[in-house]
Amino acid sequence: STQGVSSAASDVYKRQEFPAGTVPNEHNINGAEYPRIGEDRRVHFRVFAPNAKKVEISFRGEMTKEADGYWSLVSEKPEVVGFHYYQIIVDGVSTADPNGKPFFGMGKWVSGIEIPEKGVDYYSIKNVPHGLISQSWYYSDIRKEWRRCLVYTPAEYDKNPSKKYPVLYLQHGMGENETSWANQGKMNFIMDNLIAEGKAKPMIVVMDNGNIEVFKNKPGESLADARAKFGAQFPAILIHEIIPHIESNFRTLTDRDNRAMAGLSWGGLLTFNTTLNNPDKFAYIGGFSGAGNIDLKNIDTTYNGIFKDRKAFNDNIHVFFLGIGSEEHPERTKKLSDGLKAAGINNIYYESPGT
């Protein structure tokens, strides 16, 4: 427990009636009834903290204290479908929910809720052949530290010992780490389902830590300068350490036509900074809600002039994907996509409805 927060009191759960039309959050630990997700996509939170003076749920507001020592809160409006982080804040102290499984986000271990999307199951576990996610450790001379990447191999990998596979290097968002695409993003289930349906080639997917540490600008240093250093080492680590490590330890196709990179949010920026500066290494590029600094006004010189020869770029980059959710203020990404197309640079724009 933390300042009186407890996940116990299962006897209380047995006596109470749960709000109609709600089910336990899928990320609750076994036996935990709260948080609960309503059919209206609102979330019902309940926390046992009898000695607390104030309890809040991050991003959602203050809870109401009940007579039995529990505090409760219901989302003010329906939540957007998908995964969302939250913390319990008890008298000013933030903590993960003891009723939930931990997820690394916001630069620390926190809790998560899942708002299911009706009629959609591409990210659900199904009765199809399942791939394996393994840990692979290597020493980084650049960072002077041991590092870990998570590696997805398709279900057929061990059954075809002579077959080599294309590789996708997949990066997380700001404040997350190498576990995030597997834990929060369910990438293994997505890949399993796509491969089983014949919508994706069997491939290896590598997830590494983008060095997105929490940072503060040093005395006399501007926030912009500090931000410019944020994750700046990662492209070199990927090119000179991660890719050689993967190609030495897994059966990979090592030419650029069989190598892709994509990333979420800040991972999208790392993707652009890596791939657009190393076009000899990658033929597929993806930004998912991706941050970016592609300068449309100076398109011929940005990223060392990679876009200047339009035909060469379009011939060499087989897919340049820009995706974002309709609830994420997609205007900037749409403007980037339209600007690139107007300049003669092929790209695929996708706006995910309701996310």
Task: Give the residues covered by each predicted segment.
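Single conserved hydrophobic/aromatic residue that forms the stacking wall/gate
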Residues: 1-9, 13
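Non-catalytic cap/lid and distal C-terminal segments of serine-dependent acyl enzymes
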Residues: 18-26, 31-56, 60, 65-355
